[in-house]
UniProtKB/Swiss-Prot annotation:
GO biological process, one term: reductive pentose-phosphate cycle
Predominant subcellular localization, coarse grouping: plastid
Stretch list, region Disordered: 22-51
Entry's family note: Belongs to the transketolase family.
UniProt keywords, alphabetically: Acetylation, Calcium, Chloroplast, Magnesium, Metal-binding, Phosphoprotein, Plastid, Thiamine pyrophosphate, Transferase, Transit peptide
Enzyme Commission number(s) of this protein: 2.2.1.1
Modified residues (N-acetylalanine): 67
Name of the protein: Transketolase-1, chloroplastic
Compartmental location: Plastid, Chloroplast stroma
Length: 741
């Protein structure tokens, strides 16, 4: 359907883009050649620039292996492909125009590769977006979400009807301004902050590789799907993408295929102003196979051949760099930053319709395009039915493996799993909660099939190694210890992908609590996307001692208590640590953070797994009538201090209640009656103690209460001295309590 003027514009802009590549070392990969798409005719000057670019780059470094060049038979008539691609473009244009906000440029430029993926390559069932063995797609450049909504609409997903497209970016719609997996079935992960999506995709691909290695048999492949992603220049600039892609290459995730939308435009202008590295060479160095598709605008056969080649490379992920024109088809805004994040405007929409020869009304999908895409509903049903039959045969032959895999697919935990968690008495030897956490992790891994995880190069400090299992590596993907290296941000986002792959995959990841500063973006997406990742955060206070304030968390607990849909646990001993894990494993749509001590702590009388389930509970009380003289409230290592202070006060004749406030969020969920039983409203004499910022404690202790904590950075010294110098002591609690009498 493209007009002559449109094709001329396309080739002119494409030549400029490829010449732009030749201006530095970024374009040094050999590209597909000899493939001609419908209407694709580069000018002589364009060909000369390409040749000059390639000649220049050959002098810069040895050529990588050329991509296989072959004639690929298109699976679909080229005219319907053109029409389908333009349908995607104009659904995006029209939705953004109606909303008066959005990002039309990416959908207009990426429509060809996205069409080929969803219409010709990917396996999915539109009527069951949660079919286990579907291919996964991640739009890492989430601002271009109208591309994804248009694809889901054309493919027949019930979640995106025409009316939903018309409600793009509106209150209560299924088509929000960035993809949200919890809002729109068919969307795998929540993306928007750039780089998160490609890191999620690494997690999805890791999950596939791990499950395939564990459960596939020579005569039965029941886990066999690909993960595809589209990422842009912005994703490439973000450090998280390099962290995650480095691991993808190291792990050899051969079923991860990422399309790099190479359009040279960022919000502030041409990428030349800030981004001139050689992405191709970087990804080769990261262990990826790299292919360059020069013509992403109309080069359908090039895109098909690139995907075909990528699937032949099974020992490493593939990056397909697709040179596109942002806002393709817009006569006055294509290839400019102005088309990135704003509606085209009425006049430019009309000009684009004329330019691309598109006579249809807004939101109208031509009948032949509808008919063409309608086949995905029966084909998807057949794909799922065939897989179900294969799994039924697998279940008969391999019942034990099938039972484990079903648990992972459904999220149903084995009966009695919680009995594996250790329990403790006050007579049990005291220990750091990080060590007690390791006991819980290893107990859970033996009974929960989908339990896996690791640390950011701190396994021996975080105590997170699963002793019964080896390391997940390229040659041993069936193992369950994940070695993330010093990549906190990538680690968190990869775990999000693992958690969102299957309900029964329960990933955990670990580092020092203070280094959540390096991964907070991923942790926030965990909460937003309802990914039940377990964050094992050790060295939770000044109790870590001599490493000093760079390693001592102060404000971190308060900040995570402020984060929606997040459980912030700070257990005091073994029973509370086990209780925190019991909750974390069952909360599959809420991430849990466990702040754990480096220093040894005693097992306290009165603590219990059941108490943790309430979030806050009484561990000792010598009062009557629910009216103690004072209530002492502690968390983690300071609960012991509260208990010791209570004994001092009781010797002075005061009645004292000691409350463990292990998880504020769970306490907030309890009934008013229960809350009153723990914190009676007519008892205003309350003292909290926590070796962290006192921010937020006011709502717990009330206007007349007192909060003991640390509202400055820590210091380098032995832990006992730090507690004394910062006033986190029994004496300080006793003095605060006595001020009420």
């Amino acid at each position: 359907m493209a007009s002559t003027s449109s094709l001329a514009l396309s080739q002119a802009l494409l030549a400029r883009a490829i010449s732009h590549h030749g201006s530095d070392q970024r374009g040094s990969l050999p590209a597909f050649s000899g493939l001609k798409s419908t209407g694709s005719r580069a000018s002589a000057s364009s060909r000369r620039r390409i040749a000059q670019s390639m000649t220049k780059n050959r002098s810069l470094r040895p050529l990588v292996r050329a991509a296989a060049v072959e004639t690929v038979e298109p699976t679909t008539d080229s005219s319907i492909v053109d029409k389908s691609v333009n349908s995607i473009r104009f659904l995006a244009i029209d939705a953004v125009e109606k909303a008066k906000s959005g990002h039309p440029g990416l959908p207009m430029g990426c429509a060809p590769m996205a069409h080929i993926l969803y219409d010709e390559v990917m396996r999915y069932n539109p009527k069951n977006p949660y079919w286990f063995n579907r291919d996964r797609f991640v739009l890492s450049a989430g601002h271009g979400c109208m591309l994804l909504y248009a694809l889901l609409h054309l493919a027949g997903y019930d979640s995106v009807q025409e009316e939903d497209l018309k409600q793009f970016r509106q209150w209560g719609s299924k088509t929000p301004g960035h993809p949200e997996n919890f809002e729109t079935p068919g969307i795998e992960v929540t993306t928007g902050p750039l780089g998160q999506g490609i890191a999620n995709a690494v997690g999805l691909a890791l999950a596939e590789k791990h499950l395939a290695a564990r459960f596939n048999k020579p005569d039965a492949e029941v886990v066999d799907h690909y993960t595809y992603a589209i990422l842009g220049d912005g994703c490439q600039m973000e450090g998280i993408s390099n962290e995650a892609c480095s691991l993808a290459g190291h792990w050899g995730l051969g079923k991860l295929i990422a399309f790099y939308d190479d359009n040279h435009i960022s919000i502030d202008g041409d990428t030349e102003i800030a981004f001139t590295e050689n992405v191709d060479q970087r990804f080769e160095a990261l262990g990826w196979h790299v292919i360059w598709v020069k013509n992403g605008n109309t080069g359908y056969d090039e895109i098909r051949a690139a995907i075909k080649e990528a699937k032949t490379v099974t020992d490493k992920p593939t990056l397909i760099k697709v040179t596109t024109t942002i806002g393709y088809g817009s006569p006055n805004k294509a290839n400019s930053y102005s088309v990135h994040g704003a509606a085209l405007g009425e006049k430019e929409v009309e000009a684009t319709r004329n330019n691309l020869g598109w006579p249809y009304e807004p939101f109208q999908v031509p009948d032949d395009v509808k008919s063409h895409w309608s086949r995905h509903t029966p084909e998807g049903a057949t794909l799922e039915s065939d897989w179900s039959a294969k799994f039924a045969a697998y279940e008969k032959k391999y019942p034990e493996e099938a039972s484990e895999l079903k648990s992972i697919i459904t999220g149903e935990l084995p009966a009695g799993w919680e009995k594996a968690l250790p329990t403790y008495t006050p007579e049990s030897p005291g220990d750091a909660t990080r060590n007690l956490s390791q006991q819980c992790l290893n107990a859970l891994a033996k009974v929960v099939p989908g339990f896996l995880g690791g640390s950011a190069d701190l396994a021996s400090s975080n105590m997170t190694l699963l002793k019964a299992f080896g390391d997940f590596q390229k040659a041993t993907p069936e193992e369950r210890n994940l070695r993330f290296g010093v990549r906190e941000h990538g680690m968190g986002a990869i775990c999000n992908g693992i958690a969102l792959h299957s309900p029964g995959l329960i990933p955990y990841c670990a580092t020092f609590f203070v280094f959540t500063d390096y991964m907070r973006g991923a942790m926030r997406i965990s909460a937003l996307s309802e990914a039940g990742v377990i964050y094992v955060m050790t060295h939770d206070s000044i109790g870590l001692g001599e490493d000093g304030p760079t390693h001592q968390p102060i404000e971190h607990i308060a900040s995570f208590r402020a984060m929606p849909n997040t459980l912030m646990f700070r257990p005091a001993d073994g029973n509370e640590t086990a209780g925190a894990y019991k909750i974390a494993v069952t909360k599959r749509k809420t991430p849990s953070i466990l702040a754990l001590s480096r220093q040894k702590l005693p097992h306290l009388p009165g603590t219990s797994i059941e108490g943790v389930e309430k979030g806050g509970y009484t561990i000792s009380d010598d009062s009557s009538g629910n009216k103690p003289d004072v209530i002492l409230i502690g968390t983690g290592s300071e609960l012991e201090i509260a208990a010791q202070a209570a004994e001092v006060l009781r010797k002075d004749g005061k009645t004292v209640r000691v409350v463990s406030f292990v998880c504020w969020e769970l306490f907030d969920e309890q009934s008013d009656e229960y809350k009153e039983s723990v914190l009676p409203s007519d008892v205003s004499a309350r003292v909290s103690i926590e070796a962290a910022s006192t921010f937020g404690w006011g709502k717990i202790v009330g206007g007349k209460g007192k909060s003991i904590g640390i509202n400055s950075f820590g210091a380098s010294a032995p832990a006992p001295l730090l507690y004394k110098e910062f006033g986190i002591t029994v004496e300080a609690v006793v003095d605060a309590a006595k001020s009420f009498f």
